């Protein structure tokens, strides 16, 4: 008996490059962070963003104590400086890590100044015009999903 299997050989580097193009990772995406608290600074310090073409160009906060402090070489600026910064710099993506009472106001400023992509970690869902992409991130929902999966795993493996 002869078994014949079909073997497909893939050029992994080529596939990686092509998938990167589909995801838009073949260009640099300048981005800013609004909110320089714990989450904002953690995101600012995440070096893998740059490896994927996301370049941090500005960090903003409302707290004057943080003004001028550098995070990875970028000085924290005041939120009041944001409109001028957006006029003078190319920014594609804004990351919101602000309290919910500031998020909607800042989102409006971002949208009014041409930002087309917002990654929102504020504890409020943002609505935006059709030409603006918003990714509302809910950390607690992700944690609940993990909890559910853990619970299901335990049920399946009880008594083993």
What do the PLM-derived regions correspond to, one by one?
Residues 1-97, 102-113, 129-154, 160:
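Hydrophobic, well-ordered beta-alpha structural blocks that scaffold small-molecule cofactor pockets
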């Amino acid at each position: 008996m002869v078994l014949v299997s079909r073997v497909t050989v893939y050029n992994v580097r080529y596939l990686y490059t092509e998938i990167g193009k589909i995801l838009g990772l073949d260009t640099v995406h300048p981005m800013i962070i609004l909110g320089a608290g714990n989450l904002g600074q953690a995101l600012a310090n995440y070096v893998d963003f740059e490896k994927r073409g996301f370049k941090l160009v500005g960090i903003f906060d409302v707290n004057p104590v943080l003004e001028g402090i550098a995070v990875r070489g970028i000085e924290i600026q005041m939120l009041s400086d944001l409109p001028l910064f957006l006029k003078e710099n190319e920014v594609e993506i804004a990351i919101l890590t602000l309290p919910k009472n500031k998020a909607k106001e800042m989102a409006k400023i971002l949208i009014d100044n041409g930002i087309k992509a917002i990654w929102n970690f504020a504890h409020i869902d943002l609505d935006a015009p059709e030409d603006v992409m918003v990714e509302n991130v809910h950390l607690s929902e992700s944690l609940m999903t993990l909890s559910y999966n853990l619970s299901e795993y335990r049920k399946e493996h009880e008594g083993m």
